[in-house]
């Protein structure tokens, strides 16, 4: 009995059948859904011949059929994937061919929906927003203060105070009239204007020494002109004095002259100028005030130190005035302030640029005595004959007009109140005691003035008066004559009497000082450029730089809103808003730059280079607009080239086979596609910038047209070898290459997003979006247009002459339903028999095709040529590596502006002459404990100052807020110690005590109030006389924030000068003798800054080295608990260079990996992807090296070009590689096949890319020409050489094997027989197998089924033989 064996055999056969069913079901799904089952019966003999040489290129599905039939072996996984892509590309092509017009209209309608975004286009012109890295520490640091303000004001920030603060039951005394104070908006320097308005003066001719009388006078005159520039807005006239940054006047004690002095100082406190003319008395000229103050003789009569007539900084000695007024009235600690600030005689003790200047004061070191000179001149002149005598012009001396308006106001303020007080006082009693406020005891004002006059006026000397009058009348005329005739001065003056012109180099060595000599020190490198020295002294210079500061909008608003002098009567103060102040500032700045651009000294050669915060933004906005003329010219050139390459002539007009109309429409629709892409990008919130408007239109056109030429090239061939579903076949064969290059280009620009520069991210994003839109156009709209053109050609109509017929030489096209499937071939194409003849082009040797076939391909097959190519490539790579090694970092700020514009000229002058940059060290955060970290802060500042890039004035760093606070407190400690020794204070409560009728000094009274204040407590017992506010150079931590409040309010001018920029600002407070209350403690500081000046930052490597050094120090002290960061233009615009190389390496790795993965997925051949990557890497190295050798510096813009080179390089290699991979035959045959297939479209694509790029040469921006035109042109040249020359040579040596190899070893593979024949073969094979199975034993049947490949293959596909007829 054999039943167990039979059961086992049956069970095994059942399992085998189940496996076969599952396998067949799986294969059926793949073939039905993923593979097209294309039928060779549908194609012409010419197409079959093409298939025989490149089967997998033409039809991967038919290649799989041959593998199944055992006619070939190959990578079935790759071919299955290829067949899937080709099936869907074929279906897309068939669909757009059938519904061509509908596809075009619907696609264009959807595209046009994106145009709505163009209504909201924003061109970003803020260079800081364009350049500062997004998401990095720099971005966080720049936004820190704004974020802290927002959090604090919205209540989200809970500040952890490190010292115990107890809530007092009794609120402190109201400070300054219960006013909520806001800190000043200190000007921010970003190197591009900001609050710092800059003027650079350069020589009028080459070799001029600008340290000369004439040049310095020109600079002085310009400063005076700037101070008078005005604009009219809001019914008022505004000048620089209305908007400039000026410190507030110092505080005065309450008294009869306190308010008056405050008003006077508010009018006379000047704008802060940083200028080289501050070395001279002439520096006072632009300070004003304008118009001058005329206090009249009444005021001058009792303040003899005031100059008679008009009062300006040219004749004002503020220290003398304060001292004299201080003997009459109690002015508080103002004298102490003047001494610490070093105001002294202001400008009156400085030399005059020209001692013959009429207004040069007598106190000037080189004052010229015109009266003595006039006497000598008259003696000399009178000795001459009448005909030779010099006639001087007499000056009319005006009579005094009496009291001025301001004098009347002052006198009324002083005396009016007293008169009213006396009139109201009706008592006959004599006051028992005289109060301190009663400084006079005259019956009326005239008696008071007469008393002062009698005590100061001496007896008159008639002879001296006559001499002085003569000098007044003719002195000015004499000085003018002497200036015009310097060669004749020796005729009446001795050598000792000659005018004493200063040695300008000696005077300006070491820099200059403002009106506050101790607090306003302008380093030499800030104000003088192109310096030459001799023994440390300046001997010549080539440039002068002046800076004046403009306040923030809110400060100007507050100043005007609270102005009690009613200086702008036409302004509606009730409706005045901060934005209006901002408009005034920006309008004045634009007027300032406009006036200097057109200055008379800038006509022949630009000497004055201005820059305001609006300058660069305005210039970028103007030149960032689309240049439609250049764009139109560029697109016309592209149309002409496309039409030229696609034109075919027959007789007098274009032939039927010509594609000029397609080329023109393609260029136009690529343009429309790009415009719609920009609209879509705007919908996504991507702003435009100069790179967008100047580069993207041309770059997207050049890259978008490449694949259009590939489609047109294959279209010429397809219509001559196919008569059915031509567009489907076109996309099936060409669509893979189009997708391969387009996707890699898109990925390349997406990878550029790794660079954190906003402008470059916008550029890369917009370009990627435009390329994606172009890809959709190439896959849908353009094939539909080709389908329409195909109908023309089938009808025999000439190109661009549809009423004229030509010789079509082709059969009429037929089409299949759009739902072509794997089952459609035989039934739907039954009856189709007509085949097209094989098509060959006529290509003379001078055409691209003729050169290729007759010269180029034979040359590449020569081993000597191959060796030369490889040696040349190796050499280029070596030079490339050397060039990359020697390349330097850098992008000059002037390069990002149009070359011929004034802002660019300013930046070039600055780069040439001034390597000076300001910076701030910022202390920040709620974890700071400044009172107890004073020593750490000093160490931090000292270590920063030890950098070789830091400027030290006379070996010392720039003073900062804590050092100024410490000096102020030390001066108060000294005053308090002196008055305590004199017994002028009650030690228990701090109240002042008169000793011999004298009260304590104002400084000591403020000091006593501060010593008794600590936190929220006020207690003098045990503190007065026993402790100081500053001990061993350390401020007492217990009362630190109380002292800070006192300094901020009493010494507020010093606060402004310190540029501390406190946040939160201390509360308001003023000294009140009658209210002994605590000085309110300031809140712990969340933000403060200390200024530094840096020099020798001549280029990007030096700046990067400085940043690394400063950053290292900042990070060290942050780790030690002192949260801080640096700030300034150098950090703003060069910070990204610290990570540029890493970001570039990262981006190139990302795009390289992406390209490798895309090629590997689409080709399913890692070795082919590796070879492409090798060529792309070679191209990138060569490009980077040549950029270095050409002097193109490495920066974020050139980094984008290198990143994109990886993706764009695929454009020139992927086509050739794919054609080589799909070709059959020997190495040389495959080389010839791939070049014949791809050389012409790649060449035309390169030319079209170059035509798109070449229009960049007309850009106004240097960086566009340098970093896009030069590099992109070089990239195209390298890409063509490496793609069409180096890659083919490498492929002949180490190229991948063909995807398919005929089993018979031949170099051709004919297409498979028609599907109906294959079905018949399979059916016959199955029936024969079944008959044999019945004759065999079960074991033999099982063995036969497993061992026979052909039988197995036939049986596996037996279920697939359900032909449409069966169904």
UniProtKB/Swiss-Prot annotation:
The protein's role, per its UniProt record: Regulates osmosis during embryonic development. Required for larval development and in particular is involved in larval molting.
UniProt protein name: Protein patched homolog 3
Origin superkingdom: Eukaryota
Subcellular location, record wording: Apical cell membrane; Cell junction, Adherens junction
Domain SSD: 627-788
InterPro entries: HMGCR/SNAP/NPC1-like_SSD, SSD
Biological processes, Gene Ontology terms: molting cycle, collagen and cuticulin-based cuticle; negative regulation of smoothened signaling pathway
Low complexity biased stretches: 1346-1356
Family under the similarity heading: Belongs to the patched family.
Gene Ontology CC: one annotated term: plasma membrane
Glycosylation sites: 235, 310, 454, 591
Classification via PROSITE patterns: SSD
Disulfide bonds: none
UniProt KW keywords: Cell junction, Cell membrane, Glycoprotein, Membrane, Transmembrane, Transmembrane helix
Disordered: region residues: 1302-1367
């Amino acid at each position: 009995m054999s039943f167990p064996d039979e059961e086992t055999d049956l069970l095994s056969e059942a399992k085998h059948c189940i496996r076969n069913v599952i396998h067949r079901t799986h294969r059926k799904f793949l073939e039905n859904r993923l593979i097209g089952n294309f039928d060779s019966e549908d194609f012409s003999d010419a197409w079959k011949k093409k298939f025989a040489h490149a089967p997998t290129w033409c039809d991967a599905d038919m290649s799989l059929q041959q593998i199944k039939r055992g006619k070939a072996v190959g990578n079935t996984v790759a071919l299955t994937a290829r067949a899937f892509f080709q099936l869907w590309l074929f279906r897309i092509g068939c669909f757009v061919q059938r519904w061509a017009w509908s596809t075009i209209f619907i696609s264009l309608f959807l595209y046009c929906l994106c145009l709505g975004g163009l209504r909201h286009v924003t061109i970003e012109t803020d260079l800081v927003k364009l350049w500062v890295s997004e998401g990095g520490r720099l971005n966080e640091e720049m936004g820190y203060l704004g974020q802290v303000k927002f959090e604090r004001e919205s209540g989200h920030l809970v500040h952890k105070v490190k010292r115990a603060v107890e809530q007092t039951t009794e609120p402190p005394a109201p400070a300054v009239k219960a006013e909520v104070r806001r800190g000043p908006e200190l000007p921010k320097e970003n190197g591009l204007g900001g609050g710092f308005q800059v003027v650079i003066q350069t020589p009028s001719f080459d070799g001029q020494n600008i340290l000369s009388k004439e040049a310095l006078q020109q600079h002085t005159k310009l400063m005076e002109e700037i101070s008078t520039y005005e604009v009219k807005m809001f019914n008022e006239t505004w000048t620089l004095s209305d908007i400039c940054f000026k410190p507030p006047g110092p505080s005065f004690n309450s008294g009869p002259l306190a308010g008056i002095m405050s008003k006077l100082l508010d009018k006379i406190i000047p704008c802060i100028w940083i200028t080289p003319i501050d070395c001279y008395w002439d520096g006072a000229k632009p300070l004003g005030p304008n118009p001058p103050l005329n206090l009249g003789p009444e005021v001058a009569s009792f303040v003899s130190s005031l100059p008679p007539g008009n009062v300006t900084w040219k004749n004002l000695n503020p220290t003398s005035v304060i001292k004299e007024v201080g003997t009459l009235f109690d002015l508080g600690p103002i004298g102490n302030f003047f001494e610490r600030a070093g105001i002294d005689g202001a400008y009156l003790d400085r030399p005059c640029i020209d001692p013959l200047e009429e207004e040069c004061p007598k106190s000037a070191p080189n004052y010229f005595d015109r009266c003595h000179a006039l006497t000598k001149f008259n003696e000399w002149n009178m000795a001459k004959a009448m005909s030779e005598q010099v006639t001087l012009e007499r000056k009319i001396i005006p009579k005094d007009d009496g009291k001025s308006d301001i004098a009347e106001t002052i006198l009324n303020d002083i005396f009016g109140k007293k008169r009213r007080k006396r009139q109201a006082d009706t008592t006959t009693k004599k006051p028992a005691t005289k109060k301190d406020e009663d400084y006079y005891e005259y019956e009326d004002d005239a008696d008071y003035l007469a008393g002062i006059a009698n005590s100061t006026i001496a007896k008159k000397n008639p002879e001296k008066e006559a001499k002085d009058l003569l000098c007044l009348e003719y002195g000015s005329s004499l000085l003018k004559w002497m200036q015009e005739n310097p060669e004749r001065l020796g005729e009446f003056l001795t050598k000792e009497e000659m005018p004493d012109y200063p040695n300008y180099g000696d005077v300006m060595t070491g820099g200059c000082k403002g009106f506050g000599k101790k607090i306003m020190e302008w380093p030499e490198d800030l104000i003088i450029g192109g310096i030459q020295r001799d023994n440390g002294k300046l001997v010549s210079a080539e440039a002068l730089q002046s800076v004046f500061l403009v306040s923030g909008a809110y400060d100007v608003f507050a100043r005007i809103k609270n102005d009690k002098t009613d200086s702008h009567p036409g302004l509606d103060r009730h409706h005045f808003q901060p934005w209006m102040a901002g408009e005034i500032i920006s309008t004045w700045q634009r007027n300032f730059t406009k006036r200097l651009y057109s200055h008379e000294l800038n006509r022949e050669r630009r000497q004055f280079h201005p820059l305001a915060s609006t300058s660069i933004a305005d210039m970028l906005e103007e030149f960032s607009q689309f240049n439609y003329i250049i764009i139109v010219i560029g697109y016309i050139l592209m149309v002409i080239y496309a039409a030229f390459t696609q034109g075919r002539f027959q007789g007098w007009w274009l032939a039927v086979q010509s594609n000029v109309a397609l080329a023109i429409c393609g260029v136009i629709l690529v343009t429309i596609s790009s415009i719609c892409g920009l609209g879509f990008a705007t919908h996504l919130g991507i702003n435009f910038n100069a790179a967008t408007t100047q580069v993207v239109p041309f770059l997207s056109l050049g890259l978008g047209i490449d694949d259009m030429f590939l489609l047109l090239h294959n279209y010429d061939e397809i219509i001559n070898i196919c008569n059915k579903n031509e567009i489907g076949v076109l996309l099936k064969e060409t669509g893979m290459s189009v997708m391969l290059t387009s996707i890699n280009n898109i990925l390349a620009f997406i990878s550029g997003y790794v660079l954190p520069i906003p402008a470059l991210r916008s550029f890369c994003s917009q370009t990627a979006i435009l390329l994606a839109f172009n890809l959709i156009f190439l896959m849908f709209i353009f094939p539909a247009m080709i389908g329409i053109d195909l109908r023309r050609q089938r009808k025999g109509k000439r190109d661009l002459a549809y009423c004229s017929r030509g010789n079509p030489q082709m059969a009429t096209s037929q089409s299949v339903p759009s739902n072509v499937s794997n089952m459609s071939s035989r039934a739907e194409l039954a009856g189709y028999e007509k085949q097209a003849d094989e098509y060959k082009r006529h290509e003379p040797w001078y055409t691209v095709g003729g050169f290729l076939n007759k010269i180029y391909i034979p040359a590449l097959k020569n081993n000597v040529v191959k060796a030369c190519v490889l040696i040349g490539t190796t050499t280029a790579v070596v030079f490339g590596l050397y060039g990359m090694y020697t390349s330097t970092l850098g992008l000059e700020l002037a390069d990002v502006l149009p070359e011929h514009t004034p802002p660019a000229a300013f930046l070039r002058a600055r780069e040439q002459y001034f390597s000076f940059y300001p910076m701030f060290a910022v202390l920040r955060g709620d974890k700071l404990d400044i009172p107890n970290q004073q020593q750490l802060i000093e160490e931090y500042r000292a270590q920063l100052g030890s950098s070789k890039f830091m400027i030290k004035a006379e070996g010392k760093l720039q003073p900062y807020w804590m050092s100024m606070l410490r000096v102020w407190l030390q001066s108060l400690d000294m005053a308090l110690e002196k008055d305590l020794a004199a017994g002028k204070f009650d030690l228990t409560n701090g109240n002042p005590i008169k000793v011999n009728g004298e009260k304590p000094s104002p400084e000591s009274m403020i000091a006593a109030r501060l010593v008794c204040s600590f936190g929220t407590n006020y207690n003098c017992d045990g503190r007065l006389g026993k402790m100081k506010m500053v001990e061993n150079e350390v401020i007492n931590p217990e009362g630190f924030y109380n002292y800070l409040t006192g300094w901020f309010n009493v010494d507020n001018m010093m606060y402004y000068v310190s540029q501390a920029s406190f946040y939160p600002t201390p509360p308001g407070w003023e000294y009140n003798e009658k209210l002994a209350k605590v000085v309110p403690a300031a809140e712990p500081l969340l933000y403060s800054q200390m200024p530094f000046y840096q020099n020798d930052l001549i280029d990007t490597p030096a700046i990067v080295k400085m940043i690394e050094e400063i950053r290292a120090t900042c990070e060290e002290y942050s780790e030690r608990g002192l949260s801080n960061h640096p700030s300034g233009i150098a950090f703003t615009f060069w910070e990204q260079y610290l990570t540029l190389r890493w970001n570039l390496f990262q981006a190139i790795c990302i795009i390289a990996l992406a390209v490798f993965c895309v090629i590997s997925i689409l080709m399913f051949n890692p070795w082919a992807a590796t070879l492409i990557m090798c060529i792309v890497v070679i191209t990138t190295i060569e490009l980077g090296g040549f950029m270095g050798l050409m002097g193109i510096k490495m920066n974020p813009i050139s980094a984008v070009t290198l990143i994109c080179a990886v993706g764009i390089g695929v454009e020139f290699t992927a086509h050739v590689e794919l054609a080589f991979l799909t070709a059959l035959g020997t190495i040389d045959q495959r080389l010839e096949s791939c070049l014949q297939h791809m050389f012409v479209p790649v060449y035309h694509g390169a030319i079209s890319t170059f035509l798109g790029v070449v229009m960049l040469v007309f850009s106004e921006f240097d960086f566009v020409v340098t970093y896009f035109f030069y590099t992109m042109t070089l990239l195209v040249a390298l890409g063509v050489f490496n793609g069409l020359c180096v890659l083919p040579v490498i492929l002949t040596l180490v190229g991948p094997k063909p995807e398919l190899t005929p089993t018979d070893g031949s170099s051709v593979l004919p297409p498979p027989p028609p599907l109906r024949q294959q079905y018949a073969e399979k059916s016959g094979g199955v029936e024969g197998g079944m008959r044999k199975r019945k004759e065999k034993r079960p074991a033999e049947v099982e063995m036969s089924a497993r061992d026979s490949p052909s039988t197995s293959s036939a049986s596996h596909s037996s279920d697939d033989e359900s032909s449409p007829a069966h169904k």
